[in-house]
A protein has these predicted regions:
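Short beta-strand scaffold segments in enzyme catalytic cores
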Residues: 25-30, 163
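Acidic, Mg2+-coordinating catalytic module of metal-dependent nucleases/exonucleases
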Residues: 147-184
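Catalytic-loop motifs flanking and including active-site residues across diverse enzymes
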Residues: 23, 55, 157-161
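Generic structural signal for hydrophobic core residues of well-folded globular domains
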Residues: 31, 137, 165-169
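ATPase catalytic-site recognition across NTP-hydrolyzing enzymes
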Residues: 1-17, 223
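Mg2+-dependent endonuclease catalytic cores in nucleic-acid-processing enzymes, primarily RNase H-like
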Residues: 35-147, 172, 189-226
Length: 226
């Protein structure tokens, strides 16, 4: 899911922000196009000890570079006051991040990773996000209680910013222009055979995965960087 080159298309841009002070404040820029189904993570940055003024200036500068269609930020806790202050002071339209059903949306995001519909532009600065994705795990103690909560000793700020802005991206509205084969045609039977083979392979992989889930770590974002 790492891409070395971006497609030559007209992108729509959006920004996700996860607010912090002692913890990192993370900024994640994504782009998508009307002509392709993929969403691309274009730019990632993280900073500690940023004031609301610092954050507002950073967002304003990024907006000048990308001309965002959407800007979303975590408004939990004091975040709502910070976002309202920045929006007024810097004339920004910052939307509250959608945070309900986080685990369900992480699963959907993982699905997009596995399908190749979510790509990360392979740059040095974006390694900040990749490191989080590779290390972030669910808290096993919470899992025994039936709750999906990330381990508190794992960084998740860039991941959260990505999740916020991915939920706002419109790439999922893209409809493929390829035609489905006619029912009963040779192409249809070939497609069905390929589906059956993929299902059989997935079962084998799933059996191995179940063993790993029982005996190994419990990653939040899995099988995404193949």
């Amino acid at each position: 899911n790492l891409c070395e080159e971006l497609p030559d298309v007209d992108f729509h841009y959006a920004l996700g922000v996860d607010l912090g002070f002692i913890d990192s404040t993370a900024f994640v820029v994504v782009g998508w196009s009307d002509s392709a189904p993929e969403t691309y993570v274009l730019e990632v940055s993280k900073f500690t000890h940023l004031t609301s003024d610092d954050i507002g200036k950073k967002i304003k500068w990024l907006d000048g570079e990308y001309e965002f269609e959407r800007i979303v930020a975590d408004t939990g806790g004091l975040g709502k006051m910070v976002v309202e202050e920045m929006s007024k002071r810097f004339s920004l339209n910052i939307l509250p991040a959608q945070k309900r059903a986080k685990h369900d949306h992480i699963e959907l995001l993982n699905s997009d990773f596995k399908k190749g519909k979510l790509q990360i532009y392979d740059t040095e600065e974006n390694q900040l996000l990749i490191d989080e994705l590779e290390l972030l795990e669910w808290d096993l103690n919470e899992r025994t209680k039936g709750r999906f909560i990330e381990r508190s000793d794992c960084e998740n700020h860039a991941c959260d910013a990505m999740l916020y802005v991915w939920r706002e991206s419109l790439a999922f509205l893209h409809q493929s222009e390829t035609f489905q084969p006619l029912l009963g045609s040779d192409e249809w039977y070939k497609a069905e055979e390929a589906k059956m083979e993929a299902a059989a392979e997935a079962k084998v992989v799933g059996d191995v995965g179940n063993w790993w889930e029982e005996h190994g770590p419990d990653p939040v974002y899995d099988e995404i960087l193949n």
